[in-house]
């Protein structure tokens, strides 16, 4: 019985992951919203204008800022919508 209880506790801890992952949007520009699970603990959204108009890129992590690109990095689930 103790072994079963210990196994359940371990499985629960592994499944919960204690918040080390988060959910980020990862669709590009006008694509339908999609999400992914990120282990980096951050999401980003960057926007820039080109000959087609405003372009948007979303994903995990926080890339290095580039001139003329609006970059927003954040640390909560789905914060890069």
Curated annotation (Swiss-Prot):
Transmembrane segments: none
Expression sites (tissue/organ): Expressed by the venom gland.
Site (May be critical for toxicity): 52, 55
Annotated signal sequence range: 1-21
Pfam families in UniProt: Toxin_cobra-type (PF21947)
Gene Ontology CC terms, in alphabetical order: extracellular region
UniProt main location, coarse: secreted
Subcellular locations according to the entry: Secreted
InterPro entries: Snake_3FTx, Snake_toxin-like_sf, Snake_toxin_con_site, Toxin_cobra-type
Entry GO MF terms: acetylcholine receptor inhibitor activity; ion channel regulator activity; toxin activity
CDD domains assigned to the protein according to its UniProt record, in alphabetical order: TFP_snake_toxin
Keywords, alphabetical: Acetylcholine receptor inhibiting toxin, Disulfide bond, Ion channel impairing toxin, Neurotoxin, Postsynaptic neurotoxin, Secreted, Signal, Toxin
Disulfide bridge map: 24-43, 38-60, 62-73, 74-79
Family designation: Belongs to the three-finger toxin family. Short-chain subfamily. Type I alpha-neurotoxin sub-subfamily.
Function per UniProt: Binds to muscle nicotinic acetylcholine receptor (nAChR) and inhibit acetylcholine from binding to the receptor, thereby impairing neuromuscular transmission.
Protein known as: Three-finger toxin MALT0057C
Organism: Micrurus altirostris (Uruguayan coral snake)
């Amino acid at each position: 019985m103790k072994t079963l209880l210990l196994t359940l506790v371990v499985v629960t801890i592994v499944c919960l992951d204690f918040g080390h992952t988060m959910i980020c949007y990862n669709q590009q520009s006008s694509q339908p919203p999609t999400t992914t699970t990120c282990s980096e603990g951050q999401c980003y959204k960057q926007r820039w204008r080109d000959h087609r108009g405003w372009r948007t890129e979303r994903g995990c992590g926080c890339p290095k800022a580039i001139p003329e690109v609006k970059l927003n990095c954040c640390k909560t689930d789905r914060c890069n919508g």
